Each structure stands twice: as structure tokens, then as C-alpha cells.
Amino acid sequence: MAGRGKVGKGYGKVGAKRHTKKSLKETIMGITKPAIRRLARRGGVKRISSLIYEETRNVLRSFLENVIRDSVTYTEHAKRKTVTALDVVYALKRQGRTLYGFGG
């Protein structure tokens, strides 16, 4: 058993787990009800209708799609493969939502 650590008998190699792509429905449900509630509390909301949660997820998804699309456009124009913080800042500025504190 030398050289195998705590693995055991060593029947073949086990590689690293690969990331599997979750479906969009699964991913958007990752924005939990308590997380939406915390955001609403920060905005000063006292009571929340049960219909709000799904609508909030849809609005957030469309907002992020727009920001990410613009960020990737800036990245591709600069002939890079990595989206930087400045790409996101410029994408938000383009949509009229200026973000301070990240350069630019």
C-alpha cells in the first residue's frame, strides 16, 4: 500500500472531477428566496409578495445577460480572452449605470 496515501487499493486512476454545465433553470434557482429577501430589506422593503421571487430572478437574469454581452464585446474588441473588471465597468457605463471604485 505504499505510495497510495488514503485512497485504498488503487484500481485505476481517478482524474479530477470535471465541471458539468447546469441547466439555466437550475442555475437561476441558485438565487435563493432568502437572498432576494435580503436585497429587498437593504432597499427598505418590509413585506414581500410570493410572486416577487420568480419575477426578480427573471429581471436579474436579463440584466446580467445584457451586462455580460456588452462586457464580452469589449473583451473581443480588445482581442483578449479574459473579461476584466474594466470591461464590466465600461459595459455598465454604457447602460447608464456608472460604477465607481474599479478603475476607469
Swiss-Prot record:
Transmembrane domains' residue ranges: none
Subunit architecture: The nucleosome is a histone octamer containing two molecules each of H2A, H2B, H3 and H4 assembled in one H3-H4 heterotetramer and two H2A-H2B heterodimers. The octamer wraps approximately 147 bp of DNA.
Entry keywords, A to Z: Chromosome, DNA-binding, Nucleosome core, Nucleus
Cell compartments where the protein resides: Nucleus; Chromosome
UniProt-annotated stretches for the region Disordered: 1-21
Name of this chain's protein: Histone H4
Organism for this UniProt entry: Sterkiella nova (Ciliate)
Family the UniProt entry places it in: Belongs to the histone H4 family.
